[in-house]
């Protein structure tokens, strides 16, 4: 039996799931099921927000351990579902080790294109504006702010800007755009536009996963996710506040 390849499959599956926003307990569970197909005495998986460790050990082999760092994380539920389905098929014996590895490699390479990501970034504010009580004007201004947000996110990722600074700059850009438009037009609610336009940045999934990990006893990952969500929220608030002050929208007297 190719123990090394089974280990590689488990680590690759875990990496894809963790990058796609899966909870750490779910990643560990999937990896453990894959590792158990090796039928070794020791088959362990340890997952944190930024890394994965997996080990296989038996009397007739040298211990095998693999570690993978995970730097970039996002949200892609479809990829999580795909990995779960492939892992189940492999564990049921419907796929070989080689077939499973190739399928996982294909999933890892499937990412949203920049155009699709930017389109979604624009449509989210457009969808939330009516939900928050906005009318046609709020929706149109939210679309404009969404375009600015999409541009800043694309630029920030291209130059590999840190997430805290990128979130702050994006919130700043959204607030400045909305506040500047409010100076030349009237008859719409500035708060609705800013809140709607910032929704793509809100760490809702991160907070949910943090609570799930914490309730399952994974305090390290849960605490790390809570801290990440808090820093994201702080960056959004800082950027939006500075942006409004910058254009004199927060204080009628002008910039302070």
Predicted regions and their residues:
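Interfacial loop-to-helix junctions that mark the boundaries of transmembrane helices
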Residues: 68-72, 132-138, 189-193, 254-256
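Alpha-helical transmembrane segments and their cytosolic membrane-interface
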Residues: 72-138, 228-237, 248
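Catalytic cores of large soluble enzymes that bind and process phosphate-bearing ligands
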Residues: 2, 19, 23, 75-78, ...
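Soluble N-terminal domains of membrane-associated systems
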Residues: 1-95
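Generic detector of multi-pass transmembrane helix bundles and their immediately adjacent loops
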Residues: 183-256
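Core alpha-helical transmembrane segments of integral membrane proteins
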Residues: 111-188
